[in-house]
Structure formats: C-alpha cells, structure tokens
Amino acid sequence: MRQSGRKSNQLRPISLELSPLINAEGSCLIKIGNTHVMCSASYDTTVPPFLRNQNRGWITAEYSMLPGSTSQRNKREAVQGKQSGRTQEIQRLIGRTMRSIIDLQKLGERQITIDCDVINADGGTRTAAITGSYVALHLAIRSLMKERILKVNPLINQVAAVSCGIYKDQPILDLDYLEDSDAEVDSNFVFAGNGNLIEIQGTAEKKPFSEEQFLEMLKLAKAGVAELFKLQNQVLLNL
C-alpha cells in the first residue's frame, strides 16, 4: 500500500473539464489528483517558414508552470529571460506527440498551438498535459470543422500518457510528487489509441532496473492509459 492509500496499479482520481477557456478553439482543464493542468489549442493561418506553400500544417506546443503551482514559488521563466531545459524538453514532447496523431496534409497550411499551463503540480505534469492536450485538440478540430475551415477531420488517432516507476522496489502507476522524488526509477509512457507506443522516457534515479521490471511498468502503463482513453471518450461523446 502506498502513502496515498492507492494500490500499485491505481490511478489518482481524474477529471476532464471541457472548454473552460472561451477564446481558444479547444480547451480542457485536466485534474489528476492534485496535479492540475490547463490545456488549450489555438488555430493560426501562419505556419513555420519551412512549411510555406507546401499545403501542410503544423502543431507546436508551449508548456509553463504558474509561480504558485509548486510548494516554493516557481519563478516565471519570462522574467529570467530564458526557458529551462526541462520546459523545452516537455513542450517538444507534447508537440511531437500531437503531430503523431494528426494528418498534417489534411490540416492544410494551418498551425495549431497547444498551450499547457500547470496550475498545481504534484507529479506527472507532462503526462497530464499530453492527456489533456488531446482533448483540447479534439475540440479545436471539431470547432474548425463546424466553421468549415477544415473540410476533412485530420485526427487519425487518440493519445494519452501516464507515469510509472519503481518505488521501494515495487513497480507503481501514476506517481505523485512524494513518490517521484524518492523513486528508484522514473518513467513516462505515451500511447496511441490503437495500442502502439509513441514515446517512452525511462531513467534509473538510484540504481539500474531490469528488463523484467521494465515490462512490469509497461504492463501497468497499458492498463492505466486504457482508463484514460475511456474517460476521454466518455467526455467527448457526451458533447
């Protein structure tokens, strides 16, 4: 039993609030335990220079943490004049994940920017951002089709992500901050809706882990994202 009382294969309570932002084409406030992330998807007709006149679109992402999202105030990166390596890594992960589930040709010469702002951080912010961003992107695509800006749906898959780790020699699902900060192994799994993997990030924090332990984490992650896919579908089908 974990400090939170959860079983090793148990996710934290999850909720998805649709369209909390009135100006973005799509938005979602995802809450996974005490990790809360505001995700939005905004449409633009300007694409990166390397895509001009190619009739192909692009999806990019930005990620940030509000100053009050952590136990000690987190300084705004804009004030410091540069983004941290962690921020750049996470927003690139979100961007390439979303591009993997979109037919960029069908998107046309358009760009969608995914914005992920962490309101409260208690572990798993990047995986929550990916799971919430899919919902925001889905809503944005739906809005663009309703407005006849898009004639064909470019979404070709679903996506969700979850963290796993080895904590006190036991594989566990969906680590909170206390578990993450003391875990022997920390990993993130990003899955497409068809069961294929999009990305795996895994790091031994204290000691190397075995192939058997990796496969145990993979099994936990597959079961966890299945629950996330189900929740995404429930909220989107009920619109």
Swiss-Prot record:
Q: From what organism does this protein derive?
A: Rickettsia bellii (strain OSU 85-389)
Q: Which gene encodes it?
A: rph
Annotated Gene Ontology MF terms?
Answer: 3'-5'-RNA exonuclease activity; tRNA binding; tRNA nucleotidyltransferase activity
The organism sits in which domain of life? Bacteria
EC annotation?
2.7.7.56
Q: Which InterPro entries match?
A: ExoRNase_PH_dom1 (IPR001247), ExoRNase_PH_dom2 (IPR015847), ExoRNase_PH_dom2_sf (IPR036345), PNPase/RNase_PH_dom_sf (IPR027408), Ribosomal_Su5_D2-typ_SF (IPR020568), RNase_PH (IPR050080), RNase_PH_bac-type (IPR002381), RNase_PH_CS (IPR018336)
Q: Name one Pfam family in it.
A: RNase_PH
The family this protein is said to belong to = Belongs to the RNase PH family.
Q: Which UniProt keywords apply?
A: Nucleotidyltransferase, RNA-binding, rRNA processing, Transferase, tRNA processing, tRNA-binding
- How does it associate, per the subunit comment? Homohexameric ring arranged as a trimer of dimers.
Catalysis performed (reactions): tRNA(n+1) + phosphate = tRNA(n) + a ribonucleoside 5'-diphosphate
Q: What is this protein called?
A: Ribonuclease PH
List positions binding phosphate: 86, 124-126
Please describe what this protein does.
Phosphorolytic 3'-5' exoribonuclease that plays an important role in tRNA 3'-end maturation. Removes nucleotide residues following the 3'-CCA terminus of tRNAs; can also add nucleotides to the ends of RNA molecules by using nucleoside diphosphates as substrates, but this may not be physiologically important. Probably plays a role in initiation of 16S rRNA degradation (leading to ribosome degradation) during starvation.
Could you give a single Gene Ontology term from the biological process aspect? rRNA processing
Under the heading Gene3D superfamilies, the entry gives: GHMP Kinase, N-terminal domain
